[in-house]
């Protein structure tokens, strides 16, 4: 009985061993044939490629079974999720809105106001500085030539009568205008330096000492006004004329500026050396005879081109005047036609009214100045808010 029991145990052990081997072999075979991915594709383990789930059975060349090295699965430690906290983001500078520019509908066709202050903060801070010129302040540049004596017939478009000059001067006073110098105009146009709200710059072209002495000087002395001279410095000037002009300049009523050297009308075909002489030579001559450096170039005949404007900048001129009656000028507001605008230097191609319509120029300027003042008041709150938002100094400035 004992022998029979031992034999039974031995037979059962053999059967169990056979089942276990078959099961392991089946598992290995199944792994070799492939496994199915989550998207229904079959992975061919031996061929190391992905094939589509197909009803056909691929025939492959048996390869030696790889030796599988069992490694322990890594233990995954869950990292706790940190509690989100609010961290300040770097302060970014918001985009500043576009500023509204003053426009005037009654300018001549093709004439547009040009702004020239690049930094809007510089412009607005100067515009609303109480120690500077108020919005609506205007400057009227006026060009004079000959003044005809009583009884003389006027046959050209640049000469005015004594009677008209007298009328204009009285009208200017009645309207509250006064004169400014070139330096004052530069300060106003560049940084809105304070000048009279109704200003004019009277410019007498060419070499006319008699006109100065007989017709202008009485008004200059009476009103403490200044006359700007557009003076050609030609080599043909006599010593006696120089002495006469130097004596007049000593009165303090004259503001001598350049009108070229030989009064050449600059054209695109004008030789470069002639343009250079027109621009550079007067600087030295005026310094020699009047002890001042000219800061304005009144273009001879009103002619200029890109080369002459560039040379004027290099020579140190801050202003230039044409013969175009475009309108009065204001801070950061210069009315220009296409020819002047193309130069890219608004302050070197400023407009001038002709003396034959000088009184009308003053009336028009007052209208423009008043509209500009009203427009500025409407925009004041918005522009002050702009300054507060975008023009404050940053840390480290």
What kind of region is each of these model predictions?
Residues 22-127:
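Ser/Thr-rich, Proline-interspersed low-complexity disordered segments
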Residues 89-203, 210-211, 267-296, 301-397:
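C-terminal active-site subregion of NodB/CE4 polysaccharide deacetylases
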Residues 245-262, 275-279, 286:
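A structural motif
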